[in-house]
């Protein structure tokens, strides 16, 4: 079947703050071994270079040791890629003015330490609680005056210190509780809230549902439009698909199943379509930034713990650190829907083609199309106010043939599509996602030098190129072997690799840059 689509760059458009993740691993990352961090967690993060990150932090009782560990993590991750950091804290119930004043001072002390002592200048946003929780989950949704009180004490303390951190309200979940934003507006919280936000998990719609996109986009549009008169933006602080414990799988053998249902019911590959159209709906509605829950799994329960929390783009299941299928779908959006880009306006009469796009200040642009048809679609795309002197790279996520990598490397582009005037023709397979982009540079990274192998450990000199992201390590039977996917043995951000295979061989190392060139 065939279809038509128009992609337009508007003369005036608000900035997009980027896609990313809730990085829950930030508080436990020192439990990781070098293989997990260097070859998976750090490697994938630098390859995707997210523009936005939400994390637990800014607790009033945070210790120096905990903050130092957190800061070291951020230096290796968010600071490397320039991601905006949004911290969400937690606290206990305080009653007196003295207690609340001390609470606000303690939070400000810790944020100052991170920003000024540890150099985390990208800590920009703070909220006092997760999902309006204090004594119990979400209880402040019914005590909004209490939320405002805590928020006000924080605002006054931050203002007194000229602390460059925005306060966010209300962080409510699910989207039916975004009405708390309306309460905040009506009750004087706009002057003390620089940004607003909320969460949502798709518990009422199966991955195959074709109406959720429309419904979610409308909810996002409603809250975005509600805030426009006050010049405030809305952030999707957490989003995800159905929670297993709300789908009749509350626990298994006493273990609470706080997991993404799609990862356990056989729909992991197909559900990537829904998570991506959820992200595109938010972009098209004018949401400023968003964080998928989560980047890495929470470690398996131990001791008296009983909750299994498995939502990560990357697994943390004992020693299984590999990528889930969503990496090759949502990961593409994270990489190419960059921070400080501007959303494009896309129109199509085909209800089952869900699309979104952004344009960067250098004129490069990216467009993602989710095909919900059960057959391929030939699309003629008309470009308005967009020009390209180079072909568009086409990246494909086919839910029936996921381009998985043993090393959690993003897939290569599979086609170069010429732009004939202002027209582009592309085929999107059934139940698939295509991303088209001119956001790249044809560049051959400099050769890696100083490669030395001894006793199964390979070392090399670090790349000095600014656009370097990670290394690929290859092993062959002769000194003149050609590096291929078949003889790749690792991807890493380190400058060394210990080969678990003791068999002798020859090694080569390549640099992979920001555009996937190697």
Regions found by a protein language model. Name each.
Residues 241-355, 360-364:
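Aromatic/acidic polysaccharide-binding cleft in carbohydrate-active enzymes
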Residues 440-467, 513-518:
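Pro/Thr/Ser/Gly-rich low-complexity, intrinsically disordered linker/stalk tracts
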Residues 499-517:
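Beta-strand-rich modules
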Residues 45-207:
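Substrate-binding cleft and catalytic face of glycoside hydrolase catalytic domains
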Residues 463-485:
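Solvent-exposed loop/turn segments flanking beta-strands in beta-repeat/beta-sandwich domains
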């Amino acid at each position: 079947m065939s279809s038509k689509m128009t992609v337009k760059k508007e003369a005036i458009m608000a900035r997009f703050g980027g896609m990313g993740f809730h990085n829950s691993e930030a508080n436990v990352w020192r439990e990781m071994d070098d293989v997990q961090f260097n070859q998976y967690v750090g490697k994938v993060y630098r390859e995707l270079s997210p523009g936005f990150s939400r994390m637990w932090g800014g607790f009033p009782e945070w210790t120096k040791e905990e903050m130092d560990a957190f800061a070291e993590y951020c230096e290796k991750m968010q600071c490397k890629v320039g991601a905006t950091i949004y911290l969400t804290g937690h606290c206990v119930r305080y009653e007196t003015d003295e207690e609340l004043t001390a609470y606000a001072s303690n939070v400000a002390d810790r944020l100052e330490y991170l920003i000024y002592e540890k150099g985390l200048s990208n800590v920009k946003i703070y909220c006092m609680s997760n999902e309006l929780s204090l004594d119990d989950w979400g209880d402040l949704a019914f005590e909004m005056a209490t939320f405002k009180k805590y928020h006000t004490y924080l605002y006054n303390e931050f203002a007194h210190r000229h602390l460059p951190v925005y306060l966010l309200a209300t962080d409510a979940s699910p989207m039916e509780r975004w009405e708390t934003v309306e309460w905040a507006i009506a009750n004087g919280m706009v002057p003390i809230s620089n940004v607003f936000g909320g969460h949502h998990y798709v518990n009422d719609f199966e991955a195959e549902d074709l109406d959720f996109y429309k419904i979610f986009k409308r909810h996002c549009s409603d809250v975005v439009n509600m805030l426009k008169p006050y010049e405030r933006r809305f952030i999707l602080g957490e989003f995800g698909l159905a929670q297993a414990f709300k789908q009749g799988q509350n626990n298994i053998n006493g273990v609470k199943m706080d997991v993404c249902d799609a990862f356990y019911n056989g729909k992991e590959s197909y559900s990537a379509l829904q998570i991506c159209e959820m992200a595109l709906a938010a972009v098209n509605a004018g949401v400023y930034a968003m964080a998928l829950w989560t980047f890495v799994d929470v470690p398996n329960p131990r001791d008296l713990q009983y909750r299994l929390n498995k939502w990560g783009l990357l697994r943390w299941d004992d020693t299984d650190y590999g990528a889930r299928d969503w990496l090759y779908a949502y990961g593409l959006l994270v990489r190419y829907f960059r921070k400080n880009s501007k959303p494009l306006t896309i129109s199509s009469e085909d209800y089952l083609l869900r699309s979104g796009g952004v344009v960067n200040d250098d004129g490069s642009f990216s467009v993602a199309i989710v095909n919900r048809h059960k057959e391929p679609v030939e699309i003629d795309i008309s470009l308005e106010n967009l020009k390209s002197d180079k072909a568009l790279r086409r990246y494909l996520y086919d839910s029936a043939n996921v381009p998985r990598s043993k090393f959690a490397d993003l897939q290569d582009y599979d086609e170069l599509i010429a732009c004939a005037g202002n027209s582009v023709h592309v085929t999107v397979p059934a139940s698939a996602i295509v991303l088209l982009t001119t956001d790249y540079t044809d560049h051959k990274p400099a050769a890696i030098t100083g490669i030395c192998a001894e006793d199964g450990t390979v070392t090399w000199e670090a790349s000095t190129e600014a656009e370097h992201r990670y290394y690929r390590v290859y092993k062959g039977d002769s000194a003149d072997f050609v590096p291929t996917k078949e003889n790749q043995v690792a991807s890493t951000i380190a400058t060394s690799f210990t080969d678990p295979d003791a068999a002798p061989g020859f090694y080569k190392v390549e640099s992979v840059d920001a555009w996937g060139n190697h």
